[in-house]
């Protein structure tokens, strides 16, 4: 039995300077590639500016649209492969909240990258607007994951 207290493994990433939001800071960190945080920050802020312009609002409307989009894309269940006996089963499992937001961010970035707009900021903006309205590739991906979990619900008793 260890003599010292357990170490908290979750790092505090703080909040972003413009919106004061933990969610936006996390999104910037996931957009970031090769440690280029200023570039990631400018991409995300350009996307928020485009969203605000499209919604005829300010930063608060853009942030509200982003939070709504993330809520629309977050999965509740996912499937995990588990070997039981001679076969491999796709077992539906619940998704923790932290993983759900991370998956939502990844899917939004992935589907924005596959769009054909000129800049990444515009692609992200269009994906945020589409996801907030309930359509778009990221929402489709979430629905596919949920459909897969529903199809394999018979194997849910294998989760342990």
Description of each model-found segment:
Residues 2-34, 38, 46-160:
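Strongly charged
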């Amino acid at each position: 039995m260890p003599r010292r207290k357990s170490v908290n493994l979750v790092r505090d990433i703080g909040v972003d300077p413009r919106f004061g939001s933990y969610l936006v800071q996390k999104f910037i960190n996931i957009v970031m590639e090769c440690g280029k945080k200023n570039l990631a920050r400018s991409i995300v802020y350009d996307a928020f500016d485009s969203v605000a312009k499209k919604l005829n609002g300010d930063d608060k409307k853009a942030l509200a649209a982003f939070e709504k989009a993330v809520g629309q894309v977050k999965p509740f269940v996912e499937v995990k492969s588990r070997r039981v006996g001679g076969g491999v089963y796709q077992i539906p499992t619940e998704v923790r909240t932290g993983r759900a937001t991370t998956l939502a961010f990844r899917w939004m970035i992935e589907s924005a990258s596959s769009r054909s707009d000129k800049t990444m900021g515009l692609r992200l903006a269009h994906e945020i607007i589409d996801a907030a309205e309930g359509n778009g590739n990221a929402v489709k991906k979430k629905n596919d994951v949920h459909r897969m979990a529903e199809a394999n619900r018979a194997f849910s008793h294998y989760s342990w």
